[in-house]
Structure formats: structure tokens, C-alpha cells
Swiss-Prot record:
This is Nucleoside triphosphate pyrophosphatase. Pfam families: Maf. Its main location: cytoplasm. It is found in: Cytoplasm. Belongs to the Maf family. GO terms for molecular function: nucleoside triphosphate diphosphatase activity. It comes from the Bacteria. GO terms for biological process: nucleotide metabolic process. One of its GO terms (cellular component) is cytoplasm. It catalyses: a ribonucleoside 5'-triphosphate + H2O = a ribonucleoside 5'-phosphate + diphosphate + H(+); a 2'-deoxyribonucleoside 5'-triphosphate + H2O = a 2'-deoxyribonucleoside 5'-phosphate + diphosphate + H(+). Its cofactor is a divalent metal cation.
Length: 201
């Protein structure tokens, strides 16, 4: 049995993670208004945003289907970082991040339209950043890659060169925790293999 799986996100990295493990999602980016969420608690922020994204898309769908919403931020030194506002912002952030340890938080909301049930979880991974030089920081920012990433780096891209160590879930840093997703699917009463597409990853 193949269950329709909907990803309420425009993130190419999240879609690729799912495709790598055999899940070919229907991608329906959410137009949830993130500005209405004002909490300064990083865990509450990512779970609230993930839920908002998933619910907007779920309300437009018919059962049976599973809808996944995700949101990620980097917490470092008590500050919350989403996507940078531009190259200079990325440079400024990396000057703060270099040589430091941050926490990458990803909120996951999985909605089962058939059972009218949803699960909300947060995965946290610690990331040690390398002590980059000013030239390395500017060169990386000017590639444009960090401008599209929560936390200002892409672990699965050039940014992977500037991460010294990860403690916790690797895929969580890229955009969603595959082990956590499997657990959530199981908790809803499904087998993750029910989501596999007929095509090879």
C-alpha cells in the first residue's frame, strides 16, 4: 500500500533527503504567515512554524494522505538565527559562529488526514563550527549558498567544509530528521515502507 505523502515545504534539501530514502513526496509549499509567530523560545518557534505550514496545506487536501511540515533555526549564544538577509548579514553571522557550538533545531509536524491526527516533535543537533578566516567567510557568503539556509550554512554543500563535528542527527541539520520521521510514521500506525515509491532512490 502506498500512502500519498505531501511535503509542505519548498526546500530542495528536504525533498532530496526524502527521495534518498525512497519517499517521493508531493511538494506543496505552504504560504503560512510566519510573521504571526513571535515566540523567542527556539523549540516553540520551530514547532509552531512547522505546525502552521503543515496545517495550511492539510486543509487543502483530501484523505488519505500524510502531510509533513518542517522548520529549522540555529540557536547560538541565546540568539535565534533563521535565513540571513543578505551577503553582509551572512558574513556578520559567520564571524559570530566561527569556532563556536550552536544548536540546530528542526520542528516536525506530521498530519494524518485519514485519522485526523497530528504529531508534533522537535529534534536538536549540536554543531561545532570551524574557526574560519575572514577571507573564507566572505568567499562562502559570496557563493550565495548560506543565504538559503537556516543557520547560514548547508551541511550537504560547501558549508560542510566548515563544520568540525556534529552531535546528534545528521539529517536534522540538513532539514529534517529521518529517524524521527520514521518514529512518527510508526506512531501513527504505518510502516515507513508503505511510503516508498516504485522508483529507485
Amino acid at each position: 500500500m502506498t500512502i500519498p505523502f505531501i511535503l509542505a515545504s519548498a526546500s530542495p534539501a528536504r525533498r532530496q533527503l526524502l527521495k534518498t530514502v525512497g519517499i517521493d513526496p508531493v511538494v506543496l509549499p505552504s504560504h503560512f504567515d510566519e510573521s504571526q509567530v513571535t515566540t523567542t523560545d527556539p523549540e516553540a518557534l520551530v514547532t509552531t512554524l512547522a505546525t502552521g505550514k503543515a496545517e495550511v496545506v492539510a486543509h487543502q487536501q483530501q484523505p488519505p494522505a500524510l502531510v509533513l511540515g518542517c522548520d529549522s533555526v540555529l540557536e547560538l549564544g541565546g540568539e535565534i538565527y533563521g535565513k540571513p538577509q543578505g551577503i553582509e548579514d551572512a558574513i556578520s553571522r559567520w564571524k559570530t559562529m566561527r569556532g563556536q557550538t550552536g544548536r540546530l533545531l528542526t520542528g516536525h509536524t506530521l498530519i494524518d488526514l485519514k485519522q485526523n491526527h497530528q504529531l508534533i516533535r522537535c529534534q536538536i543537533t549540536e554543531v561545532d563550527f570551524a574557526p574560519l578566516t575572514d577571507n573564507q567567510i566572505r568567499a562562502y557568503a559570496e557563493t550565495g549558498e548560506p543565504l538559503h539556509c537556516a543557520g547560514c550554512f548547508a551541511l550537504d554543500g560547501r558549508g560542510g567544509l566548515f563544520v568540525e563535528q556534529i552531535r546528534g542527527c545528521h539529517s536534522n541539520v540538513i532539514g529534517l530528521s529521518l529517524p524521527l520521521l520514521r518514529q512518527m510514521i510508526t506512531e501513527l500506525g504505518y510502516d515507513v515502507t508503505d511510503l516508498w515509491s516504485n522508483e529507485s532512490p
